[in-house]
Regions:
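Outer-membrane beta-barrel porins/channels
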Residues: 1-339
Length: 339
């Protein structure tokens, strides 16, 4: 078969909050962020074959696209995120913490999808027998055999189940859970001299309790952990340089040959892999009100390998292995304007 899929996800946020300075050293913040989510997915699977036979010849021999699967789905939804934070400064040290509560979002589907059906399989097989020279009465007897009827019923059930698993998430009119997980950030900053600033941080995303389609999050071992470190140096009054590192570690389950389907998290539509990122950046201070920022970072993604046994028939099965990874390079340019 031939397959293709692409997608985009845009999450627009508008935050409103207030901070209060309790003393020269301690301040606190509380606020809320409104989130509007807009996503789009398009993909297809074509030229599906069973063995060497095109599947459409079984489903509808008169239509070559009868077995094709095509997905075109827009999703949108709204959510709200309460946020709290604290900051404490003493001497050359700065300590800060922020917690963002879970954002409940339900994405509404608007879809124009094409999916195959095997409801006409008995009639198509009957017609194929007759076209091949089998008498009509004999063809009717074959198709009407209880064992044949039972096998085709079982095949239809399995076909519909697998199809629902593949694209049921994008069915037109359906509302899909797409929560943004709760998020804890801890940071420590230290400035040994005025021109040098060193920062380290820790992030925790509570992915395991952020509801997703079919409660997929329950398959995770834990939420995502991130560790960060960075250094910023004022070279002179005009130029500031910086570098940083981040480690991202997802709580992915093991997926070996004996892992049941109900415990498998990774799939071809959506996957994540742990990574390390390194970055460099610079600021050119144009004047007191304008700064030009440039940055580059590269992410080194790990490989997540999975294996499963696919049962082709009662007597035959194959071992199917996947290797998930990706690549990422980001360049950024920005202009800060202080009014």
């Amino acid at each position: 078969y031939n397959s293709y899929m692409h997608g985009r996800q845009y999450y627009y946020g508008l935050s409103l909050g207030a901070a209060y300075k309790f003393s020269d050293n301690f301040s606190a913040f509380a606020g809320v962020r409104g989130v509007y989510a807009s996503t789009n997915y398009y993909g297809y699977v074509e030229d599906i074959k069973v063995g060497n036979m095109p599947l459409y010849k079984v489903l509808d021999p008169t239509k070559e696209t009868a077995a094709n699967i095509e997905l075109s789905c827009d999703q949108s939804g709204v959510g709200f995120t309460p946020i709290i934070g604290v900051d404490f400064k003493t001497g050359k040290w700065n300590f800060a913490a922020k917690y963002e509560f879970k954002t409940r979002i339900r994405l509404k589907n608007k879809s124009v999808n094409q999916v195959p059906s095997i409801g006409n399989l008995p009639d198509n097989l009957r017609n194929a027998y007759i076209a091949g020279g089998v008498p009509e009465a004999a063809a009717n007897a074959i198709i009407g055999n209880p064992d044949i009827q039972g096998a085709m019923g079982q095949l239809k059930t399995e076909f519909d189940t697998k199809l629902e698993k593949a694209i049921g998430e994008y069915e037109d009119g359906k509302k899909i859970a797409g929560d943004i997980p709760a998020y804890l950030a801890l940071g420590v900053g230290y400035s040994p001299v005025d021109a040098v600033r060193v920062n380290v941080g820790f992030h925790w995303f509570d992915d395991k309790h952020a509801t997703s389609y079919n409660n997929r999050q329950e398959k995770l071992k834990r939420g995502t952990l991130e560790y960060n470190a960075g250094v910023e140096v004022d070279v002179n009054k005009k130029i500031t340089l910086s570098t940083g590192w981040q480690n991202t570690n997802y709580g992915l389950p093991d997926e070996n040959l004996d892992t049941p389907a109900s415990k498998r998290y990774m799939d071809d539509k959506s996957f994540v892999v742990s990574s390390n990122s390194v970055a460099v950046g610079g600021v050119y201070h144009i004047n007191k009100k304008m700064d030009l920022n440039v940055a580059y970072f590269h992410t080194f993604y790990q490989h997540k390998k999975t294996s499963e046994m696919v049962q082709l028939s009662a007597e035959k099965s194959i071992n199917y292995s996947s290797d998930y990874t990706r690549n990422n390079n980001v360049f950024a340019v920005g202009l800060d304007i202080n009014f």
